[in-house]
Amino acid sequence: MKAQSIEDLMNQVSTANLQTSVAQLSGEQSATINGSTQTITSRVHSNNDLAADYIKERLETMPNLTVEFQNFNTTGKNVIATQLGQTNPDDIYIICAHYDSVTTYCADDNATGVAAVMEIARLLSNQCTDNTIVYALWDEEEIGLRGANYYAQQAADETNGNTRDNILGVINMDMIGYDGDAPGAAGDNDFDIDVRNIANSIAIKDDLISILNTYTFDLNEIVVNPGTTASDHSRFWNQGYSAVLVGESWETNDQTPDYHTSNDRVEDIDFQYMTELTKLVLAYTATKANLIAVDNTVIQTATDLTSNQATGTYQWINCDTNTPISGATNQSFTPSTNGNYAVEITNGGCTEISNCVNFSVLSNEEFQPNEIKVYPNPVKSIIKIDNFTESEIDITINTISGKVVKKTNSRKDYIEIEFDSTASGVYFVNIKSKTKASTYKIIKE
């Protein structure tokens, strides 16, 4: 996975994925479960093992997750997927939703929340984080918040030498798919943040609002304080943990009219609205878990490709065949043939892959100082090149990451290249003729 910004990840939230997951969880669409095509006809607590298997299997396809059932009575089982933090594994953020229902279908309550958790896990499991993320899907919410209650009690238990889990924040998504306007239509897009002044719950609310103001969303928050205790987040409040509920706006009476009935169907879900809420919780999670940056940029010269990540292990890849190159495991790589190349970098348990870089093999002979001169260095506005070779030369100027910013050719003995509008930084001027090639590092002030 390439290094991602939070905004990059938000833009990758897939409405189509959310639609498919909600349709499959609510039994409107079949899915492959336990190796065969099946339909989830029930998520009622007494008959929802197939739904649990579906969730667990989907999470198990994602990298960097440890997925398990947490059984808490003869029929109840939570699905817990843990993404261990690389720096602070004991600092935990939980993103959760209940997967059980009171009757058939129940698309909004709460296939929407489960689908959002799985979509966030799909995107963040490819990233490395400083802190631990737990993706939790609760059972038996509808008959007393039992699954979340068990987890929270176990996390807080300090008897018999146990250590209280350092859960820093919980976001519970319960019913995030209904907005009173026609699905996909412009409207108020109100949603509730239910919060109480327990532990640092108010700070979670503030962080969510900060994210709303930092990135672009089509959402309008309604802060409910004191918030409802009728969903799983409240069981974390009971144990003194920081938690909030994110969901459609009961506070403004803009919740599904089909609540707790089999009329709660996919056709009534506003997937644009649901996508926005999923993006919001993803951005919060990525921010608090703190994405670890592995530099996946590549420096390109006339003769070599070099990873800009100074530490780690490396594997160069032939992008044209999508295969690793045998023996190419150093920070720098000298291609022997023309082609497209990338490098996979692993550092501290985190793996990133660079963009593919097009490389043309050139002569190993370099220009002599009396043949080519590139100046001034540093440069402010004009790059000057003296060409004493009496040959045509190709000139390509790249950023440190390999991006081409200028490209030209000339056989003149004096060449000027406008550089005033180019951003400050380090650049490489690659000059080649039919028989020689050299790279010159310059600094733009």
Region annotations inferred by a language model:
Residues T20, G27-L84:
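A non-catalytic alpha/beta surface segment that caps or lines the substrate-entry region
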Residues L9, L18-S26, V67-Q70, N78-T82, ...:
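Structural recognition of the beta-strand scaffold that forms the well-ordered cores
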